[in-house]
Amino acid sequence: MARRQRKAIKSEINIVPFLDVLLVLVLIFMATAPIISQSVQVELPDSVQSQEVSNEDKVPVILEVAGIGKYAISIGGERQEGLTEEMVTQLSRQEFDKDNNTLFLVGGAKEVPYEEVIKALNLLHLAGIKSVGLMTNPI
C-alpha cells in the first residue's frame, strides 16, 4: 500500500483577503467621517481679546439675534425690532445695494443657540453679503 502524502499546511498569511478587508474598512471610515464631523457639538471659548472694527467713520449695520427667530436690526442708529427672516434679508439687501462697502455685524445674546447665529449669517449671505463681523464683549 502506497501512502498518500497530504499537502503541507501553509503557515503564511494570505494577503489578498486581508487587503480586501482593509479596503472595506477604509471605505466605511471614509463614508462615516463626514457624518461624524457634522454632528459635533461646539463649546466656544470666551473672548479674551477683541478687535475694534472701523470703516471710515461709517455706521455699521448691526443684526442682533435676541432669541429663536427674533431679530432686530440697527441701520444708521435706527433700531427695528421684531423682524422676520424675509424682512432681515430685504433690509440687508437694500443697505448693501446702497453701498457695497457697508460693514455688517452680527451679535447674539448669550442664551441664543449657536444655530440661530448661523441662521442670521445665512440670511445675510442670501442678501448677497460676503463679509460679516461677529460682535463680542471683552472679558
Curated annotation (Swiss-Prot):
Key words of the record: Cell cycle, Cell division, Cell inner membrane, Cell membrane, Membrane, Transmembrane, Transmembrane helix
Transmembrane segments annotated in the record for this chain: 15-35
Name this protein carries in UniProt: Tol-Pal system protein TolR
Assembly description: The Tol-Pal system is composed of five core proteins: the inner membrane proteins TolA, TolQ and TolR, the periplasmic protein TolB and the outer membrane protein Pal. They form a network linking the inner and outer membranes and the peptidoglycan layer.
Organism: Haemophilus influenzae (strain ATCC 51907 / DSM 11121 / KW20 / Rd)
Domain of life per record: Bacteria
Family: Belongs to the ExbD/TolR family.
GO biological process, one term: protein transport
Free-text function comment from the UniProt entry: Part of the Tol-Pal system, which plays a role in outer membrane invagination during cell division and is important for maintaining outer membrane integrity.
A GO CC term attached to the entry: plasma membrane
Topological type in the membrane: Single-pass membrane protein
GO terms of molecular function: transmembrane transporter activity
Localization, UniProt: Cell inner membrane
UniProt xrefs under InterPro entries: ExbD (IPR003400), Tol-Pal_TolR (IPR014168)
Taxonomic placement: Bacteria, Pseudomonadati, Pseudomonadota, Gammaproteobacteria, Pasteurellales
